[in-house]
Each structure stands twice: as C-alpha cells, then as structure tokens.
Amino acid sequence: MFGIGIPELLVIFVLILLVFGAKRLPEIGGGLGRAIKNFKKATTEPDEIDVTPSSEKKHKDE
C-alpha cells in the first residue's frame, strides 16, 4: 500500500487530529465518505442523455 505502514498511518492521523481538532473529525470523515459514495455511484451509473428538444430551437424555427 504505497509503502505506508501502521506507524505512518498513526502519525498522519495524529497530525490530522492536531490540525482539525477532535470535534471536526466526524464531519470530515462523513463528508469524505459521502464524496466516495457519490463518486462510485457516478462511475457505475450509465450516463443519462437528454433527447428532448430545447425550447430555444423551437422558437428559432418559428
């Protein structure tokens, strides 16, 4: 895993704890989790293509 072991992860966690504080960690974790969930959802869903004609095109034809 990129040469990062448990000691390095603990140091990173402590630094994040010092920077953001204990109160904000759940907010940051929740936001990160939602972002990952939305990214996975966006990559697995097929793209929706809008096939309805636009209203501008109708007005130009008249």
UniProtKB/Swiss-Prot annotation:
Major location (coarse): membrane
Residue ranges of the TM segments: 1-21
A single Gene Ontology CC term: TAT protein transport complex
Listed GO biological process terms: protein transport by the Tat complex
Location of the protein in the cell: Cell inner membrane
Primary role: Part of the twin-arginine translocation (Tat) system that transports large folded proteins containing a characteristic twin-arginine motif in their signal peptide across membranes. TatA could form the protein-conducting channel of the Tat system.
Name this polypeptide is given: Sec-independent protein translocase protein TatA
Organism in which the protein naturally occurs: Oleidesulfovibrio alaskensis (strain ATCC BAA-1058 / DSM 17464 / G20) (Desulfovibrio alaskensis)
